[in-house]
Amino acid sequence: MEEILATLKEQQTTRKIHHLPVIHHGQVFVRRASIGDVDQIYDIACSVGKTRKDSYQGFLIDDYKADPEYYKAKFKGAVFELNHFYVAERSDVLLGFLMAYTKKQWLAKNPGWIEEIHWHPEFDMKKTENFVLVDKTAIRADLTSRGIGSRLYRKLIRDVRAREVHNLFGETVVDPVPNFASLAFRKKQNYTLAGVHYERYNGKIVTDLVYHRFV
C-alpha cells in the first residue's frame, strides 16, 4: 500500500495542472443536491466515468456517455430518494458530488450485500447494524486533489452524526483496473479495510475493497 501511495503522489505531482486557479475554501459551498443540478452532476460523472479508466486520477466504474437519458434519470431518482446526496459548488458551477445511502436504502437496492462480503476476520459485524454507505464521490476531472472531496465528506459526517449514525462504508475497485486515487482518499479519510466484495459487472468479475470508518 505504501508503495502504491508513493507512486500516486509522484504521478499527481508530475501531472498537476498549473494553469487552473486555486480554489479557496471560502469560495466553495456544499449543499443538498436538487433536481436543477442533474445536468451538471451528469457532466461531472462523464468527466471521470469513461470507457478508459485512469487509476491515478480516479474514476467511476460506469461509462456515463454511453446512455445519457438512463444516467440522468438515475440521478433524478437519487435526488428525490437519498437523504445524503450533496454537491459542491462555486459561483453556481458544480465542482463535485457525493451520493450516500442509508442501510435501508442500500439493502433495498442490494439485498444480499452484507452476505456477499468476505469480511475481515477481525471486523466487528455489529458495525453493520446501522450505517451509511458512500456509493459515489466524483470531482470534475480537472479539479481533483483540491480538497473538494474532503468538504463533501465533512457535510456528510455532520449530517450522519446528527442522525446518530456512526458507521460509514465505501467500496474501491482494485480489479480489473485499480483505483489508486480512491485508495489514497480512503487513507486520507481514515478508513480501515473491512472486507472484499466480488461482483459481476458487464459480464466481468469486479473486485472491490470494502472500507469502514467510525464517525
What are these regions (language model features)?
Residues 1-39, 43-55:
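Conserved N-terminal entry element of GNAT/NAT acetyltransferase domains
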Residues 49-73:
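Conserved GNAT-fold acetyl-CoA-binding loop/helix
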Residues 72-87, 103-108, 133:
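A short helix-loop-beta-strand connector motif used in the catalytic cores of GNAT acetyltransferases and
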Residues 82-98:
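Conserved beta-hairpin
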Residues 99-136:
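Conserved acyl-donor/pantetheine-binding loop and adjacent beta-alpha core of acyl/acetyltransferases
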Residues 131-134, 144, 160-178:
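Conserved GNAT acetyl-CoA-binding A-motif
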Residues 136-139, 145-160:
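Conserved acetyl-CoA-binding loop-helix of GNAT-fold acetyltransferases
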Residues 150, 162, 175-195:
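Conserved active-site alpha-helix within GNAT-family acetyltransferase domains
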